[in-house]
Amino acid sequence: MAQITAALVKELREKTSAGIMDAKKALVETNGNMEKAIDVLKERGVAKAAKKADRVAAEGMTDVIEAGNTAAIIELNSETDFVASNEKFLNLLHLTAKVILEHKPADLKAALAIPVEEGTLNDQIVQTSAHTGEKITLRRFNVVEKNDNQTFGVYSHMGGQISVITLLENSDSTTAKDIAMHIAAIAPKYLSREDVPKDVVEHEKSIQMKADDLGNKPDNIKEKIVEGRLGKFLDELALLNQPFVKGEGESVAEYLKKQGATIKSFIRYQVGEGIEKQESNLADEVAKQING
């Protein structure tokens, strides 16, 4: 039997917004398996939608820029948000975006080797890290290119916590930016329903089929109910099916059709996606409530 620690309960609560005892019970039932515990809570309707499973956990900043037919988006991480707002960190952030846009490196190794005024980009990162006293890393970047018939939409949100690039055809810059703003706010995972991997759909279906509220309903009724829920699940994940944030009930697809535009791709960065933070004092608070 795995030991159910306060830290484990805390992590599950952060991912699902479940209560302390619900989280502890799910972990006990699944012998401490985090993914299975999340599924158990979803089946019982205790967990929030899957968005909570992707809690942001690191500090730093994103940046996005464009010039001509090229756009670049980057994420630079620090250990604290205090350093992320430091002038030297911000100067490094903008320098990094600028040289990556200019040089279009193939990977992180090539990006860090880009020559700058004083040595390489990596040298600048090390120097800024030494000045701030914190580890600073270039976590990721993307360079996107377009043709003359295409339009970029670039947008940064929450002071650089989120950045987005959209690539549209037959679009003006206002429409492209509006879509980028929508993506920043709503965080779609995929462009369309068809882009959602089959295993993601099947996994969600298996959870919904076990949902407590379906009870002893006949299988054919269960299938219809689950089909409806899967439709809503896919609409939440797929950009084109989401209600457009600046519209009046229309979907993103309907808005784009009205504008005569087509979206080809998008990239959304949010600081710290998928990075584990160090444990905070909240674990101690959870322990007190569990052991009460």
Curated annotation (Swiss-Prot):
Q: Principal place where this protein is found?
A: cytoplasm
Where found?
A: Cytoplasm
- Tell me the disulfide pairings in this chain: none
Q: Provide GO CC annotations from the record.
A: cytoplasm
Keyword Signal on entry? no
What SUPFAM superfamilies would the database entry show?
Elongation factor Ts (EF-Ts), dimerisation domain (SSF54713), UBA-like (SSF46934)
Asked if the Swiss-Prot or TrEMBL record annotates the protein with the keyword Nucleus, the reply is no
- Listed CDD domains: UBA_EF-Ts
Q: Which Pfam family, an example, fits this chain?
A: EF_TS
**Record GO terms (molecular function):** translation elongation factor activity
Q: Which UniProt keywords apply?
A: Cytoplasm, Elongation factor, Protein biosynthesis
InterPro entries named among the record's database cross-references:
EF-Ts_dimer_sf (IPR036402), Transl_elong_EFTs/EF1B (IPR001816), Transl_elong_EFTs/EF1B_dimer (IPR014039), Transl_elong_Ts_CS (IPR018101), UBA-like_sf (IPR009060)
Positions of the region Involved in Mg(2+) ion dislocation from EF-Tu?
80-83
Q: What does this protein do?
A: Associates with the EF-Tu.GDP complex and induces the exchange of GDP to GTP. It remains bound to the aminoacyl-tRNA.EF-Tu.GTP complex up to the GTP hydrolysis stage on the ribosome.
Q: Which family does it belong to?
A: Belongs to the EF-Ts family.
Protein name, entry field: Elongation factor Ts
Q: Which organism is it from?
A: Oenococcus oeni (strain ATCC BAA-331 / PSU-1)
What taxonomic lineage is listed for the species of origin?
A: Bacteria, Bacillati, Bacillota, Bacilli, Lactobacillales
Q: Please state the gene responsible for encoding this protein.
A: tsf
